Every structure is written in structure tokens, then in C-alpha cells.
Amino acid sequence: DCPSDWSPYEGHCYKHFIKWMNNEDAERFC
């Protein structure tokens, strides 16, 4: 299960802000 402010996606958890970021910006947070 993901924390309440994260979203499950393809077996991973993402914070909502990643939805409006492009892939390169999102990868910098990994």
C-alpha cells in the first residue's frame, strides 16, 4: 500500500506532483 498522499502506479508509488512533471524532472527525484 502507498502512503495516503501518494498514488499507486504499475506497482510503484508516486507523489501527486509527478503527474505534472515530465519524465526527466521526475527521475531527478528518484
UniProtKB/Swiss-Prot annotation:
Domain C-type lectin, chain residue ranges per copy: 1-30
GO annotation, cellular component aspect: extracellular region
Disulfide bond entries: C2-C13
One annotated GO molecular function: toxin activity
Location within or outside the cell: Secreted
The entry's keywords: Blood coagulation cascade inhibiting toxin, Calcium, Disulfide bond, Hemostasis impairing toxin, Metal-binding, Secreted, Toxin
Keyword Secreted annotated: yes
Tissue expression notes: Expressed by the venom gland.
InterPro entries noted in UniProt: C-type_lectin-like/link_sf, CTDL_fold
Highest taxon, organism lineage: Eukaryota
Functional description taken from the UniProt entry: Anticoagulant protein which binds to the gamma-carboxyglutamic acid-domain regions of factors IX (F9) and factor X (F10) in the presence of calcium with a 1 to 1 stoichiometry.
Family assignment from sequence similarity: Belongs to the snaclec family.
Subunit structure: Heterodimer of subunits A and B; disulfide-linked.
Remaining remarks: Calcium is required for ligand binding.
Protein name per Swiss-Prot or TrEMBL: Snaclec coagulation factor IX/factor X-binding protein subunit A
Species the sequence originates in: Bothrops jararaca
Taxonomic lineage from the root: Eukaryota, Metazoa, Chordata, Craniata, Vertebrata
